UniProtKB/Swiss-Prot annotation:
Keywords: ANK repeat, Chaperone, Repeat. ANK repeats lie at residues 45-75, 79-108, 112-141, 144-173, 177-206, 210-232. Acts as a chaperone during the assembly of the 26S proteasome, specifically of the 19S regulatory complex (RC). The gene is psmD10. SUPFAM superfamilies: Ankyrin repeat. It holds the Pfam family Ank_2. Gene3D superfamilies: Ankyrin repeat-containing domain. It comes from Dictyostelium discoideum. This is 26S proteasome non-ATPase regulatory subunit 10.
Amino acid sequence: MSGTKFRTGGTKEDDLLEFVKVGKLLEVKDLIENQGVKADCKDEDERTPLHWAAAKGQISVAQYLMDNCKCSPNTNDDGGWTPLTSATSAGHTHMVKLLLEFGADPNTVNDSKRTPLHYASSKGRSDIVDLLLTHGAKNRKDDTGSAPIHRASSNGSVATVERLLKGEANINSTNNEGDTPLHIAAEYNHEDVVECLLKHGADTTIENKDSKTPIDMSSSQTIKYLIKEFKK
C-alpha cells in the first residue's frame, strides 16, 4: 500500500497521529499543508490518520482528510481493517454515516472475515446496522461461520435482530459448530431474542454438531417453555 510508515519517536508523522486522535484540526492542517507530512502516512500497524480519526470519532478531521486530502476510506491496515470497520467497532454512528457518504465499502472484510455489519451486530447497534444495510451491506459469514445475526443473537439485541431479519438475514443460518441464531440466543438465555426468532419462524428442530437442538442449549425454563409452545 502507498504511504509513508511512521513509528513512535517524535517525528512529524507521530505528531500528526496524536493531533488526529484528539481532534486538533488546525494542527493537522498545518502539518499536512505547511510541513509536508503526507495525509496518508501509516504507522507500524499500517493504520492511516483516517483510521485513527474514524476510531476516535473525530468527524471534522475525517471530513478534512477525505474531502481536502482525498484520503481513501477503503485503505486496509495490517489486519484488514478499514476506517469504516474501526468506526463501526467503536460505535461512532455519525462517523459511519460520513464514511459511507464518502464511498466506504460496507462489505469490506478483515483478516477474520468479519465485516462492519458483524461488529455493529455484536454491539447491538441497530442504528449502525440500519445505516450499513441501507448502503448495501450483505449478510456474510466470518471465519467461525457466524453471520451478523449470530452476533446479534449473542448480544441479546432484539432491535438488531429485527433489523437484520428485515434485511433478509437467514434466520436458520448455521455456524461452524452447527449453531443457528436460535441456538445462540437460547444458550445465552436471551428470552426476548428467542421469542423474536420464534415469531419469525426459526426452526426449533435443527441439531448442531453436538446433536443439540436450541431447547437443549438453555438453562432458562422460560425459554424452554417458549420453544415447546412454538413447536406445538
